């Protein structure tokens, strides 16, 4: 691997052209002849793939009355378009980074779930250690490399007079950092020249006591368009905006109101179209309005969005897909078979949770000429039933049925359909997959070429298929057998379409993909044509492309921008590579200082890559700025008033001067078998050399996940360190991500085997090397979800030798109870891996829990992800053994995130104070009773 040393060339505009209106390229009517589809004969290509016509019909409508939600929530989506946004507390012109995030399966709920009204997004700071603070006593350690961070101090400052903080400070938002709203508005097509990119974005502003949406430009600071407020009246009823989408011409908006969360990414709500030329706001509705008890004829939709070129609005109602032209106001029904078992353009539970990570299953051609959508058939999938307990108006329990396939049981089946907007015909696409195939991704390479990925049921064999619409040709361009590297197929990152460039004699579309190379590391590969089977590897090395992967592309210089952990496995930086140069040699450029090894950056680029949102997330105070890409690469060196400072951290920096913040070190330990394990050590600011300290081990450990990085944090673990005077270790066992398949593949077919062994060995070695500072009678472990499972498996293995206390939140206790796609991806089916399921990966030695001084178990009753059945089975086994050395807290009607009815605050208070009592030995006199 070599990094090029040439400077990245960029254009500077002296004159900026007037922004032109984007006219639709669509000149044929939507669903011509006023019919849903036209009668055509099926077409067959040379491979025998058949495209069949479907004739949709009209639908009836029903709506559920729900309370209005007068605040905005943050929305995450796999869609390439970014103009749909949700915010916390729309009444303020900025939102707030928060204290807090908790891991769910694959780290996803902390990243993607809809936060509560005052939920703050993780905020945090652990600032570089000042060499002037000589009073700090560090734990001796032979473990290198190490990075230590702590508050910066002035020459006259010391830790005297500073105080510790507790979980209450975290929950009260004492460390919250306000952040201005900033979101790029995507153009209707990729901007190929930087001179045509004004850096159009929207923000919010308080005007006369009301929140207004404002469109602005990074190029022209004087450009400002008021798009209206976040409240409006319809038929005399006031509605408050929860989500907003803005088209590039700034003449149409889509609002979402009254949103009710369903699962991790999905919700239902009312959607509206606003015409900025007239000021009119009308509901987006199916053709037949409902008789809702709002008496307004409104319908709750799963979502509503602009198409990429802004010619259409598409939405899902009652699991059917609808389309309407932006200016027509009349929706057409595309599908007719939507039901509780059939999902059109919308994933079912398992596809939303484990595969697509989105509330949508539709992929638009970039010019709006066509769209492909998926239909999921859950008819044969078994239900789980979740009860609601807290409805005071119900004498009998209400329940919710969710289609939830478990290992070895029936999975949903999928079909793909092509909607041709130019002739109004809908075709079925013969994917060539098997009955139990899984659809992993879809993306248009060009306006006429659709690429998708499918695997076998066990996610071991991947087929990448490309379908060319004009020729009706379908080819499998890549086949990956993960059995060859003892791995599995994971959820994939989006590809980047590369357009033709005649001046370079590039006449065809191609694309950049991210997948493992021959050494097992995830890298960039260039496929020069849509049907190319042999790619050009662009990056190489014992590191991986991480985060969102490709974050931007500059057409003029053929430069690709991506994030990776090349400098350090726990950090992340921005890189670029020239597509032209890299066809002959592997040259990529680090765009940030390589000596800043522990920095963790994330970027979001504008369409032409001229402008960027730069987010430095650690290890120091988080900073978020926006401006020209070349001027926001290093936020520490920004002294330019023209750069937008989005984080407002003045009060935060002033407040933390009053606290002794913990010291964080990033370390590596080599185990007895030669495997290298990364971990984070968090210590109190002022260690007493005469005192022995408890240890809390924090673990997640899910296969392919990377939970512990150099992102800064002032959250639960830091509160434990500061308020309870505890040392925290955060350990990444083998099987986790970021280090290639040689490290990741240890988890295959034996979840819960290597994680507890690595955790136990790291903890023991740490204690041995620092024995003079460690109280070995007070060693605890905790985790949430997969982390709860790992904690319990560690206790089972350790049998009280090292760990004396454990806390498990929403844990899996038996993998036959979890969902099929996630579990079989790593474990195969139970009939194929009996030993793995029933001997290695289940918790079965319940007698080992007798050796604990105390166990704390927490779960929510409405957990649609890890069902409370897992916890009840565990507790039942403890009861059968007569064990009473455990505590349990059940949260009624809370899902996997445990947030319902003030639960999020209470769960962390419970964990914190339970741990306080444990380390104060208040449980030690409790006898373990036996039957």
Swiss-Prot record:
Glycosylation sites: 377, 814
Ranges of compositional bias, category Basic residues: 1-13
Biological process according to GO: peptide pheromone maturation; proteolysis; response to pheromone
Enzyme Commission number(s) from the entry: 3.4.14.-
Enzyme class (EC, first level): hydrolase
Compartments it resides in: Vacuole membrane
Gene Ontology CC: one annotated term: trans-Golgi network
Positions in the Cytoplasmic compartment: 1-119
InterPro entries: AB_hydrolase_fold (IPR029058), Peptidase_S9_cat (IPR001375), Peptidase_S9B_N (IPR002469), Serine_Prot_S9B/DPPIV (IPR050278)
Annotated spans, Disordered: 1-58
Active-site residues, as the UniProt record annotates them: 785, 863, 896
Lumenal-side positions: 141-931
Disulfide bonds: none
TM stretches of this protein: 120-140
Bias type Polar residues, positions: 33-50
Swiss-Prot/TrEMBL keywords: Aminopeptidase, Glycoprotein, Hydrolase, Membrane, Pheromone response, Protease, Serine protease, Signal-anchor, Transmembrane, Transmembrane helix, Vacuole
Protein's membrane topology: Single-pass type II membrane protein
Alphabetical list of Pfam families matching this protein: DPPIV_N, Peptidase_S9
Family: Belongs to the peptidase S9B family.
Stated role: Responsible for the proteolytic maturation of the alpha-factor precursor.
Name used for this protein in its record: Dipeptidyl aminopeptidase A
Organism: Saccharomyces cerevisiae (strain ATCC 204508 / S288c)
Lineage, highest ranks first: Eukaryota, Fungi, Dikarya, Ascomycota, Saccharomycotina
GN (gene name): STE13
